[in-house]
Amino acid sequence: MPKSTIRIATRQSPLAMWQALYVKEQLQIAHPSLVVELVPMVTKGDIILDTPLAKVGGKGLFVKELELALLSSRADIAVHSMKDVPIDFPEGLGLVTICEREDPRDAFVSNHYDSLEQLPAGSVVGTSSLRRQCQLKALRPDLIIRDLRGNVGTRLSKLDNGDYDAIILAVAGLKRLKLTERIRSSLSAEQSLPAVGQGAVGIECRLDDHDTQALLAALNHADTATCVKAERAMNTRLEGGCQVPIGSYAIWQNDKIWLRALVGAPDGKTILRGERLVSPEDAEQAGISLAEELLDKGAREILTAVYQGNTAI
């Protein structure tokens, strides 16, 4: 008998709830008689807000509790922002669906300046991401980068209170929360290469739950999945988490996949870059070879220093 109800494990932040409701809506469009319930929960990454993410340690800060709900059958699927999904999954769980990607770029948000270029020397810019930090420091070593934690609303409040001259957020998150007017400019991939999977929503479930996987098939966006899998293959070879200075971005260029990647020292003084243009069937292998190229250039030393806690600005 076909499954009649699906329970979605989700974080409680407004953006996470948007993602879960989006998946609920898409499931009910594809399967009108399906009952979809949300199971909101709090993750470690939501609780520890007074410490930079890179120093909290561990992988899966925003997903572990959701995965426990899957393993204990309190939920059938977990909905994630792909940039938060670790490279490894607990035994019995896996990523089965990747939805169509929203704009993956980073957004420059400020109340007084229209672009990164307009910021005066000494301006304070907020971000919790070492990936954004290293690229900002490389572009503008005269800026002061300060840690910025909390959900999107909290971060915007800190900007509005005058704690920062500008902050960097994901374009996708602002668009999904109907806050597009806060975007003063979008950073190009040359200015700020996006995070692995940025802008895409992924769905995790139990690998033996074939009924649920069959229901999810309608939500998978093949072109997005090809790109994100290439980005994740690179990240896997680098053994990267979601809180390290790694960028990876794949797009379709005619019938090829153009994959770009970087690893940067947090101080921005060293940025290693590489790219590949390959057939879609070779995209994941291209991610692996691109990672090996970056490792040969010195990425291992940069990442080892980060894992040892050397994230000083």
From Swiss-Prot:
GO molecular function: hydroxymethylbilane synthase activity
Pathway membership: Porphyrin-containing compound metabolism; protoporphyrin-IX biosynthesis; coproporphyrinogen-III from 5-aminolevulinate: step 2/4
Modified residues (S-(dipyrrolylmethanemethyl)cysteine): 242
Keywords carried by this UniProt record: Porphyrin biosynthesis, Transferase
Cofactor(s) the protein needs: dipyrromethane
Catalytic activity: 4 porphobilinogen + H2O = hydroxymethylbilane + 4 NH4(+)
Job description of the protein: Tetrapolymerization of the monopyrrole PBG into the hydroxymethylbilane pre-uroporphyrinogen in several discrete steps.
NCBIfam families on file: hemC
Comment field (misc): The porphobilinogen subunits are added to the dipyrromethane group.
Stated family: Belongs to the HMBS family.
Protein name: Porphobilinogen deaminase
Species this chain originates from: Proteus mirabilis
